[in-house]
Amino acid sequence: MGQSVVVLGAQWGDEGKGKIVDLLTEEIGAVVRFQGGHNAGHTLVINGKKTVLHLIPSGILRNGVLCLIGNGVVISPAALRKEIEELEDTGLEIRSRLKISPAAPLIMEYHIALDQAREKAAGGRAIGTTGRGIGPAYEDKVGRRGIRVADLHYPDQLAEKLRAALDYHNFVLTRYFGVDGMDFQRIYDEMLVFAEYVEPMKSDVAGILHDLRKQGKRVLFEGAQGTLLDIDHGTYPYVTSSSTTVGGALSGAGVGVQDIDYVLGIAKAYATRVGGGPFPTELDDKIGQGIRDRGVEYGASTGRPRRCGWMDIVALKRAVAINGITGLCITKLDVLDGMDKLKICIAYEYHDKRSEYAPLDAQGWEECTPVYLEFPGWNESTHGITSWEKLPPAARAYLCALEELAGCPIGIVSTGPDREHTIMLHDPFA
């Protein structure tokens, strides 16, 4: 039987999953995206060259690796085509290696208009979405009015479904938000063009995954966003619209729990968050700004500055428990170089009581005050180090503390953006 590893974010996203997925894809059969859409921004740096992927799995830069987009992903036709063409312009062969589930929902133009109208109307109460139609597309999926890749094969039924969806969404756009509605014919014509384009890539992703496992191939499941943004387990309502946990990998790709052999949780050596929502360890001072500057903490998809703070073990332990994380990968250790002291949040003060568990609602999180342990920093550079023994003693002590406090072993440490800037303590496929 083959081996399968799930790679997912153990914080609020932006943990560096793309680099780690690329690192682990050297000798595997396939990489599969199972949730989210082009709101993801997975940055890969190989020999100093930067590539940012939004929809296509990070294994695409490895020759011969099959890249799959599962039924749990919402697909923007325009974004997908743009990303494919940009990669093909670099000389990569894409379409023969990219397989897309017919059950994947499409992000339509009216989803984007609705997303942006909502955020504008919400003002200071906005969730902080990317404005790319992700949430409304998932709403249509659950509301059973979504248009899926499979629908493109049937022009008459597509027209019928599109008219029904437009009747609903144009009413909301024009009557509730007071913005322009969408034109049926233009969108329909665009969908017919996309139907022809995507047809050769359409394939039974779940079936491919089952066959690969029987053939003894290695498969990597690539998560987007992070556990604390999960629609069920995150800081609701300041969450994304999909399941970012290991449960999302099962339902979003079409595999069973017995098909997963290892869950790798990715976490930065500190913490970041984009958009609104509670963030107990946030540093709204020069220390936080310093981390942002050194870590280049700006969104790969939106360019928005990320909020920065100390490592939050309470939140990390929750991610470990929810996902059954087998091992952790700690990224961006080098960003902490040169800091006099470091802090790790080990508990919260909540309503005059100390708790090592996170509240289950956003308001509760907002009312938490972090309890910190302080650690000495280090002046030596860790950038590009590939051996545990060569890390400064204080850096090793910090990582050992993270491991002990989280109750989960650290298998990988990333010391820079390049594929080679990595300390491999345990290979998830070993």
Curated annotation (Swiss-Prot):
<feature type="binding site">
    <location>
        <begin position="332"/>
        <end position="334"/>
    </location>
    <ligand>
        <name>GTP</name>
    </ligand>
</feature>
<feature type="binding site" description="in other chain">
    <location>
        <begin position="14"/>
        <end position="17"/>
    </location>
    <ligand>
        <name>IMP</name>
    </ligand>
</feature>
<dbReference type="GO" id="GO:0005525">
    <property type="term" value="F:GTP binding"/>
</dbReference>
<dbReference type="InterPro" id="IPR042111">
    <property type="entry name" value="Adenylosuccinate_synth_dom3"/>
</dbReference>
<feature type="binding site">
    <location>
        <begin position="414"/>
        <end position="416"/>
    </location>
    <ligand>
        <name>GTP</name>
    </ligand>
</feature>
<protein>
    <recommendedName>
        <fullName>Adenylosuccinate synthetase</fullName>
        <ecNumber>6.3.4.4</ecNumber>
    </recommendedName>
</protein>
<feature type="binding site">
    <location>
        <begin position="41"/>
        <end position="43"/>
    </location>
    <ligand>
        <name>GTP</name>
    </ligand>
</feature>
<comment type="subunit">
    <text>Homodimer.</text>
</comment>
<keyword id="KW-0963">Cytoplasm</keyword>
<feature type="binding site" description="in other chain">
    <location>
        <position position="304"/>
    </location>
    <ligand>
        <name>IMP</name>
    </ligand>
</feature>
<keyword id="KW-0479">Metal-binding</keyword>
<feature type="binding site">
    <location>
        <position position="41"/>
    </location>
    <ligand>
        <name>Mg(2+)</name>
    </ligand>
</feature>
<feature type="binding site">
    <location>
        <position position="14"/>
    </location>
    <ligand>
        <name>Mg(2+)</name>
    </ligand>
</feature>
<dbReference type="InterPro" id="IPR042109">
    <property type="entry name" value="Adenylosuccinate_synth_dom1"/>
</dbReference>
<dbReference type="InterPro" id="IPR033128">
    <property type="entry name" value="Adenylosuccin_syn_Lys_AS"/>
</dbReference>
<feature type="binding site" description="in other chain">
    <location>
        <position position="225"/>
    </location>
    <ligand>
        <name>IMP</name>
    </ligand>
</feature>
<dbReference type="InterPro" id="IPR042110">
    <property type="entry name" value="Adenylosuccinate_synth_dom2"/>
</dbReference>
<keyword id="KW-0547">Nucleotide-binding</keyword>
<feature type="binding site" description="in other chain">
    <location>
        <position position="130"/>
    </location>
    <ligand>
        <name>IMP</name>
    </ligand>
</feature>
<dbReference type="GO" id="GO:0004019">
    <property type="term" value="F:adenylosuccinate synthase activity"/>
</dbReference>
<feature type="binding site">
    <location>
        <begin position="13"/>
        <end position="19"/>
    </location>
    <ligand>
        <name>GTP</name>
    </ligand>
</feature>
<dbReference type="InterPro" id="IPR027417">
    <property type="entry name" value="P-loop_NTPase"/>
</dbReference>
<dbReference type="GO" id="GO:0005737">
    <property type="term" value="C:cytoplasm"/>
</dbReference>
<dbReference type="GO" id="GO:0044208">
    <property type="term" value="P:'de novo' AMP biosynthetic process"/>
</dbReference>
<keyword id="KW-0658">Purine biosynthesis</keyword>
<keyword id="KW-0460">Magnesium</keyword>
<feature type="active site" description="Proton donor">
    <location>
        <position position="42"/>
    </location>
</feature>
<dbReference type="GO" id="GO:0000287">
    <property type="term" value="F:magnesium ion binding"/>
</dbReference>
<feature type="binding site" description="in other chain">
    <location>
        <position position="240"/>
    </location>
    <ligand>
        <name>IMP</name>
    </ligand>
</feature>
<keyword id="KW-0436">Ligase</keyword>
<feature type="binding site">
    <location>
        <position position="144"/>
    </location>
    <ligand>
        <name>IMP</name>
    </ligand>
</feature>
<comment type="pathway">
    <text>Purine metabolism; AMP biosynthesis via de novo pathway; AMP from IMP: step 1/2.</text>
</comment>
<keyword id="KW-0342">GTP-binding</keyword>
<feature type="active site" description="Proton acceptor">
    <location>
        <position position="14"/>
    </location>
</feature>
<feature type="binding site">
    <location>
        <position position="306"/>
    </location>
    <ligand>
        <name>GTP</name>
    </ligand>
</feature>
<feature type="binding site" description="in other chain">
    <location>
        <begin position="39"/>
        <end position="42"/>
    </location>
    <ligand>
        <name>IMP</name>
    </ligand>
</feature>
<dbReference type="InterPro" id="IPR018220">
    <property type="entry name" value="Adenylosuccin_syn_GTP-bd"/>
</dbReference>
<dbReference type="GO" id="GO:0046040">
    <property type="term" value="P:IMP metabolic process"/>
</dbReference>
<dbReference type="InterPro" id="IPR001114">
    <property type="entry name" value="Adenylosuccinate_synthetase"/>
</dbReference>
<feature type="binding site">
    <location>
        <begin position="300"/>
        <end position="306"/>
    </location>
    <ligand>
        <name>substrate</name>
    </ligand>
</feature>
<comment type="function">
    <text>Plays an important role in the de novo pathway of purine nucleotide biosynthesis. Catalyzes the first committed step in the biosynthesis of AMP from IMP.</text>
</comment>
<dbReference type="Pfam" id="PF00709">
    <property type="entry name" value="Adenylsucc_synt"/>
</dbReference>
